[in-house]
Amino acid sequence: MKTKRVTIKDIAELAGVSKATASLVLNGRGKELRVAQETRERVLAIAREQHYQPSIHARSLRDNRSHTIGLVVPEITNYGFAVFSHELETLCREAGVQLLISCTDENPGQESVVVNNMIARQVDGLIVASCMHSDADYQKLSEQLPVVLFDRSPSDSALPLVMTDSVTPTAELISRIAPQHADEFWFLGGQPRLSPSRDRLAGFTQGLAQAGITLRPEWVINGNYHPSSGYEMFAALCARLGRPPKALFTAACGLLEGVLRYMSQHHLLDSNIHLASFDDHYLYDSLSLRIDTVQQDNRQLAWHCYDLLSQLIDGQAPEPLQRYLPATLQIRHP
């Protein structure tokens, strides 16, 4: 049986007041416009009893906003993006804003489709971890809709941006480990066209240099950020060497997931490999295999994205427009 939605008119009739009076009370303006306290309390009590919910559409028409924002990420199963999405959704919920999430699977064509779908749903703004080669489409879009980029940045973009400084903490981590492995230290990365891949390789190279070690080109192996790519790259490396590598840095926890799966399947978890990675995971504390990591602050990333976008939606000029956040090291080796 179809249920009937409770309306302001229904509340007004039950409370014995006009629809206009009920509307004022339910919209929080009753006291301001001198509706009697007894009347306000009666209207609100009936609204609670009837489980009245205000119409989002009416609210949107009233203030010309949808009170929704869109989040576009490459994949929601990625641990970092999943934690970021959770933190952002919490901020939105507390502010009375609905968060819509879409995934691109690192496909620029699919990214265009999901962004257009968000626009069609009249979101008030977008937060995007883009896989596009340039920001040209977002530059044009930003003229009519607030857009904040996060996690990665097309080259020389002037758009609002929030991301972790990958270079500095990666260099610090590698400079600590490298002196013990001067003859061999491997890097497994994602797509080189993405700024996080370039930044983390730059930090890796810088960390080696700080330890007095020159990067050998053959130490760098790139694929994509899916766990299957980490598995395949590590399998090929072990086959090439005839043994596990002595030291390895993965540019994301997804890649490390693939490495650990291969190691588990081939009984290598007790080997002497020194593992390090960008991105931390709480499960690493439970492993007998020690893993040193660079830990991003997803709560701060989400807060700064929401802060930037909220100010842009309100027509303000936030400062700074581009924000690079620090990361911390999680050292598990003695």
Curated annotation (Swiss-Prot):
Residues 8-27 bind DNA. Repressor for the scr operon. Binds D-fructose as an inducer. CDD domains: HTH_LacI, PBP1_FruR. One of its GO terms (molecular function) is transcription cis-regulatory region binding. It holds the Pfam family LacI. Residues 6-63 form the HTH lacI-type domain. Keywords: DNA-binding, Repressor, Transcription, Transcription regulation. It comes from the Bacteria. GO terms for biological process: response to fructose. The keyword Transcription applies. This is Sucrose operon repressor.
